[in-house]
Amino acid sequence: IVAGAAKGLKSLDIKTAIDTIHRTHVTDRNGLLWKIKTIAQEVSAIAYQFDEFKTSKRKNQGFNKLTFLVNDTSEGKKMSAACKETSGLIQGIDLAKNLANRPANICTPTHLAEVSISLAESNDNLTTQVLEELDMEKLKMGALLSVSKGSREPAKFIIIKYAAENPSQAKPVVLVGKGVTFDSGGISLKGGAGMDEMKYDMGGAAAVLGSMLAVSIIRPEIDVIGVIPATENLPDGNASKPGDIVTSMSGQTIEILNTDAEGRMILCDALAYAEQFDPEAIIDIATLTGACVVALGEHATGLLSNDDNLSNDLLTSGTRSGDRAWRLPLWPEYHKQIESPFADMANVGGRAAGTITAACFLSKFTKNMAWAHLDIAGTAWKSGIQKGATGRPVPMLVDYIQSKALDRNCDED
């Protein structure tokens, strides 16, 4: 109903609309906040247009105001709070979309760092820090630097923090987003078909920045930290070669069998770095494997975790927000596929169970933390006539963060 109405309004170039659909009874989904979020997200998704680089803007710019009718003052207060929360979420989703849709010559690692700095300057509850390659060398981030060495664009390591107004003594939630702003595959070069879409390989980083913006507006009572390793993956005379062995920040050695498995290389150093925050939970988000697209298509994000409670919470948030995930196993048998005769591990484990073996690799850097991995290779963007970023999994992440804040408040009461 909502999608049909929104498409009709857009086609008629109507700028404002009044909603009464939120009064409709929905079985098992009758909460006001859920209805407002669902309606506003659907309308926003249809109204969204990415035309930053169009010299002639589209005539139909879509509507820009949605009004919800209320019965009384009490309902109005609830509606106002719901609208503010929903507005924050939509702004976060749109930021994630805009970042991912920008071309790789614009959205470089430096650009991601600049956006993070801008967010901190515009929001008093956000702070940011950007590490340069020299800093990464001092931290011995050999895995991340093995990817960036093939590009003339300097890598950036971004830390962005949200500080709650009245934080509890509980630990923060940490989000780690893969920020490969263009992925050619490196020396293990990808085929040319569809390579333009490899600008979307920073979808994890976009989701982290979008989530941090949303959180800064919604202001849940929980500290959140975003960590983004940002780089390009390109081939030149200095690029890593298949067979190279590097030492990660954790001290573990990695045999690089495929330079196109670079996402896990930059994430492993980011995960090792994030351990210093002693997080309650750490969630990495990455367009990591084509195998996940084969397994789950474009509808469900792949979820793998070493913690059942964290996994169940994310699955619940995915269902509640309409941004669903499906859990895959991390059984010991799969770990054997990434064994190396020359190093502590290999960065790939063959064609079979590619999504799982990639997560097995990451799990070796999260042994002391409750950790979840979200593989968004199938859900971060769409191809074809609807080509463009989706903003996922910002809705799931924001819902999870809000639910953890509410859980803590209940515990303290």
What are these regions (language model features)?
Residues 112-413:
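A generic structural signal for tightly packed, nonpolar segments enriched in small/aliphatic residues
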